[in-house]
């Protein structure tokens, strides 16, 4: 009876404990996933900023470069806190377009701009930004431009090289203003209302320094020093420092530096192989990366690498940059008149892609890329050589057979008619 009473008391206590737990809804099971992060306010949350999105691979915050096709090649976009280096083409015709697309994307998304140049006033650069293409407003014009530049062979179903139809196609088409990445009309200028409503800062080198300053060996040039101080002040004063908590709404700072490393910036790497300022550019990039890593900012730099005399400096600059994209124009080269490249204006080379929070980079399988500037659009496409449908090959083979027949002589090179060549 004592044992039964003991069991009864244990059962009663267990029942009361279950009743108490059911009333308080307390359980030892905790769900791992989005719900747990929502209920826990102290956990880290991803910053939500207009014109950005997280990477599906490493969770890094991405911004668009202004060219959705280039975003696709870079793994979804340009990561915040990184440097995009554009190797200028020989005559500096197409690289300014990528520079302006990057700035125009920032204005459309409401980002803050910092434009630095030693050649052109930043205010004049903003006046030349392309106009954005949106869904309903410019869809008709976009379709007409694509239709006018579409090759007839693109509509024909492939019978021999049918495997090319299975390749993924580059994204092309206008999108809404709320989506990630936009398209722009290169034949029109951005409305003045958008430029006036934007928040931007300009750094024009001739207005910041005088020509009488002397540069000490193994130190930064005055232009690089002034620019770093200017960028640092904007990051800390405007609230783009990610290491310190900010009370106001977060935003992205887009930094654009034009013609960096050229003699206009007071650098001599384009004039001599072993100049006195050979380490000035690499020091500047090293300090710039330190500023970007701890801030909500992204930077694009155009550099005339084809003018740099010392190739070792180019290798160091590539290492200090996160993303390196090279433009090779056909102007002035043999490929300009080559019929194989008649549909393109140049080649684009993805030389380096960053490895951020990952062991490997999100590298595209496509290596052969070309670009062309249409009436309104700057497009990046896979390089496809046209099929050889001409009769030049057959004519050349006939001429070779005729010459060989003459050398062989009438005994074995002539047929019964005496006028026909040897046919294999």
Curated annotation (Swiss-Prot):
Pfam families, per database record: PAXNEB
Organism domain of life: Eukaryota
Pathway(s) annotated for this protein in UniProt: tRNA modification; 5-methoxycarbonylmethyl-2-thiouridine-tRNA biosynthesis
Keywords of the record: Cytoplasm, Nucleus, tRNA processing
One of the GO biological process terms: tRNA wobble uridine modification
GO molecular function list: phosphorylase kinase regulator activity
Primary location class: cytoplasm
UniProt keyword annotation of tRNA processing present: yes
Compartment(s) where it occurs, according to its Swiss-Prot or TrEMBL record: Cytoplasm; Nucleus
CDD domains per UniProt: Elp4
Matching Gene3D superfamilies: P-loop containing nucleotide triphosphate hydrolases
GO cellular component: cytoplasm; elongator holoenzyme complex; nucleoplasm; transcription elongation factor complex
Tissue: Widely expressed.
Noted disease: Aniridia 2: A form of aniridia, a congenital, bilateral, panocular disorder characterized by complete absence of the iris or extreme iris hypoplasia. Aniridia is not just an isolated defect in iris development but it is associated with macular and optic nerve hypoplasia, cataract, corneal changes, nystagmus. Visual acuity is generally low but is unrelated to the degree of iris hypoplasia. Glaucoma is a secondary problem causing additional visual loss over time.
Function in brief: Component of the elongator complex which is required for multiple tRNA modifications, including mcm5U (5-methoxycarbonylmethyl uridine), mcm5s2U (5-methoxycarbonylmethyl-2-thiouridine), and ncm5U (5-carbamoylmethyl uridine). The elongator complex catalyzes the formation of carboxymethyluridine in the wobble base at position 34 in tRNAs.
Entry similarity comment: Belongs to the ELP4 family.
Subunit comment: Component of the elongator complex which consists of ELP1, ELP2, ELP3, ELP4, ELP5 and ELP6.
Protein name: Elongator complex protein 4
Classification of source organism: Eukaryota, Metazoa, Chordata, Craniata, Vertebrata
């Amino acid at each position: 009876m004592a044992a039964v009473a003991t069991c009864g008391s244990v059962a009663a206590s267990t029942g009361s404990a279950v009743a108490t737990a059911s009333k308080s809804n307390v359980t030892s099971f905790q769900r791992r996933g989005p719900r747990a992060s929502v209920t826990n306010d102290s956990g880290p949350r991803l910053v939500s900023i207009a014109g950005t999105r997280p990477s599906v691979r490493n969770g890094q915050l991405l911004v668009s470069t202004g060219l959705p096709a280039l975003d696709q090649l870079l793994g979804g976009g340009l990561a915040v806190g990184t440097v995009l280096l554009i190797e200028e083409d020989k005559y500096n015709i197409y690289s300014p377009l990528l520079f302006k697309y990057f700035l125009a994307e920032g204005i459309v998304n409401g980002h803050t701009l910092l434009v630095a140049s030693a050649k052109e006033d930043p205010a004049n650069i903003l006046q030349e930004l392309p106009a954005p293409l949106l869904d309903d407003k410019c869809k008709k014009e976009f379709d007409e431009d694509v239709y006018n530049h579409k090759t007839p062979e693109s509509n024909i179903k492939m019978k021999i090289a049918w495997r090319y139809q299975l390749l993924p196609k580059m994204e092309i088409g206008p999108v809404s203003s709320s989506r990630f990445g936009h398209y722009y009309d290169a034949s029109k200028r951005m409305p003045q209302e958008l430029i006036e409503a934007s928040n931007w800062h300009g750094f024009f080198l001739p207005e910041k320094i005088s020509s009488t300053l002397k540069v000490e060996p193994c130190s930064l040039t005055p232009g690089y020093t002034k620019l770093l101080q200017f960028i640092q002040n904007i990051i800390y004063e405007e609230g783009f420092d990610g290491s310190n908590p900010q009370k106001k709404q977060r935003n992205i700072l887009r930094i654009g530096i034009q013609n960096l490393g050229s003699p206009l910036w007071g650098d001599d790497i384009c004039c001599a192989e072993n100049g006195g300022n050979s380490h000035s550019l690499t020091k500047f990039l090293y300090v710039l990366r330190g500023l970007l890593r701890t801030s909500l900012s992204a930077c694009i730099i155009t550099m005339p690498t084809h003018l740099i005399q010392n190739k070792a400096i180019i290798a160091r600059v590539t290492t200090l940059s996160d993303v390196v994209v090279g433009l090779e124009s056909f102007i002035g080269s043999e490929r300009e008149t080559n019929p194989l490249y008649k549909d393109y204006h140049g080649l684009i080379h993805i030389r380096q892609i960053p490895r951020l929070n990952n062991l490997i980079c999100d590298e595209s399988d496509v290596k052969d890329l070309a670009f062309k500037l249409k009436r309104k659009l700057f497009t990046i496409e896979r390089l496809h050589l046209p099929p050889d449908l001409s009769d030049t090959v057959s004519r050349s083979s006939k001429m070779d057979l005729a010459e060989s027949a003459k050398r062989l002589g009438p005994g074995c090179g002539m047929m019964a008619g005496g006028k026909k060549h040897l046919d294999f």
